Every structure is written in C-alpha cells, then in structure tokens.
C-alpha cells in the first residue's frame, strides 16, 4: 500500500514540475534578455588598453572581504572585442548586484588600476554574459543596461 502511495505522490510532483513552465524571456534586439530576478554578475569589460589582471583581481578579492553575504568568486575571461573580462559574483538578483557595483566603483585602488584604459562596468546575467562574449556587441548590451537597470 505504501508503495502505491509513493507512486501517486511522485506522479503529483511530476505534474507540478510540468505545470511550472520556464520563464520565456523576450530578447532585446535578438541578443539579450532582461530578468531582474535572475542571478547576476558584476563585470568589468576591458575594451582597450592594458591592465595588470592579477592586480585587478586582487583588488576585487580584497574588496570582497568587506562584502556582507559571504564569498564572492572573482574570475577572468575574454571575449570577442574584449581582451579582458573580470566578473564577480554570483549575486542573487539585479538589486544586490547593483548595490555591489555602486560600492565597488568607489574603491580608489580600483579607480587607480583602471586609469588610462577603456572599460565598462555593468551587472549582467550568465546568459547575457555568454551572448556578449560571443557577439562582442557591447553597444546593444549598454542600451539594455541603461534602460533596464539605470532607468535612462
């Protein structure tokens, strides 16, 4: 009898899982999606110039020691049109990521390490970061970032 109850309970759980469709997000200019509730990274997108990536990552790791909520992972990668992308995260949503962005950009050590280079600092979801790395289309992402996250 208990085996039969388990089977029924499993079927109910399966139906619940089927009934909750994944959120289908509309793409902005066929490239990026906008979802404030998704996990986000803070990203420094280096577009021109040379920066000591190890020093930059150490500055971010040191700054993260003061961040409430635990360990943040600092990683570096690259992408089309980006010699260097440094990410910090993951943050539970865009609000938390934006709070981090506002705080970290006040760091004098960070400002000094980014002198004389071209870069953008943004918050971004994993899917959008993957799309940005492949496409290299920063202009479209910056439009979405300004409209969606900055309200401009």
Can you describe what each PLM-predicted range is?
Residues 1-152:
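Acidic/polar low-complexity segments and flexible, solvent-exposed patches
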């Amino acid at each position: 009898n208990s085996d039969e109850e388990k089977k029924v309970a499993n079927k109910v759980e399966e139906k619940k899982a089927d009934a909750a469709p994944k959120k289908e997000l509309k793409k902005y200019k066929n490239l990026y999606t906008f979802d404030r509730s998704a996990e986000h990274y803070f990203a420094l997108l280096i577009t021109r110039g040379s920066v000591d990536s190890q020093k930059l990552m150490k500055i971010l790791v040191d700054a993260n020691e003061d961040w409430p909520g635990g360990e943040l992972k600092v990683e570096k990668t690259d992408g089309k049109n980006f010699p260097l992308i440094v990410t910090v995260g993951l943050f539970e949503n865009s609000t938390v990521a934006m709070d981090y962005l506002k705080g970290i950009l006040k760091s004098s050590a960070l400002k000094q390490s980014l002198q004389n280079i071209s870069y953008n600092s943004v918050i971004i979801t994993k899917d959008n970061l993957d799309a940005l790395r492949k496409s290299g289309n920063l202009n479209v992402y910056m439009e979405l970032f300004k409209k969606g996250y900055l309200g401009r």
